[in-house]
C-alpha cells in the first residue's frame, strides 16, 4: 500500500482502487479554525469582567459629567415642558380650526368652500419652519409678542389645515344613507350633521388624528428657529456646553420615542373603548 501526497490529500492505493484520505501526519497542512474571542479560563473571565466594569463606569461618569453636573438635566426637563405645552395647545387650536373649516368645506356655499380651500392649500404648501418665521418676524413682529405664544399660534394654524382635511374626509366618508335616515326621522340638516354624522366621523378619523398629534410633537423640534427652547434645542445647548453630542441628543431621541409610544397606546385604548360602545 503506497501513499502519495496530492495537496492536502493522500492517495492510498488498495486492491479495490484508489481511496483519498487525510493522514494524521498531514494535519498540519489544514487551515486552522479561527480562534473564538472571549474568556477561555478563570483568569480571562476576571479580566473580561474588569474591562466591562471599566467601560460601564466610564459610561456612567460620562453621563454624570454631561447631564447631572451643573444640573444640565434641568434644561431637558424645561425643554420637554415647552414641547408638550406647544403640542397640546397647538392641537387644541388645530382641532377647533379643523372642525370650523371642515364644515365650511362640506357646505353648499361656494364662497365658504373657497375660503376653506385657500386656507388648507396655503398652510399645507408652505414648510412649517417658514411659517414659523413668517409669524414671528413678519406678522407679529410689530406687536413684540412672546416667542412661545407665536410658536403656539403658528403650530396651531398649521395643524388646523391638516385637521381640516382629516375631518372633511371623515364627514364625507359616512354613507349618505345616514343623512337620509336622519332627515326621514324629522331632523333638519344641521341636526342630522351634529347628532348622526359627526359622532360616526370622530370614530373614523381617530387613527389619522392620532398621527397628526404625533407628527405635531416631533415638529416642535423646529421651534428653535425663533429661539424657543424646545426639547431638541435643550439637547443642542448641552452639546455645545459639554462637547458631548451623543448623550444629550440620544436622551432627546429616547424621550421623543417614549412620548410617541405613549400617545399611540393612549389613543389606541380610546379607539377600543369607542369601538366597544358601538356593540
Predicted regions located by residue number:
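Short linear motifs in low-complexity or flexible loops
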Residues: 2-3, 14, 21-26
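Short hydrophobic alpha-helical segments enriched in small aliphatic residues
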Residues: 6, 17, 26, 42, ...
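Basic polycationic patches enriched in arginine
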Residues: 12-13, 33, 40, 54
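Charged/polar low-complexity intrinsically disordered segments
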Residues: 20, 27-31, 40
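Intrinsically disordered, low-complexity segments
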Residues: 33-35, 60
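Short, Lys/Arg-enriched N-terminal segments with co-localized hydrophobic residues
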Residues: 39-59
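Transmembrane alpha-helices and adjacent helix-loop boundaries
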Residues: 53-279
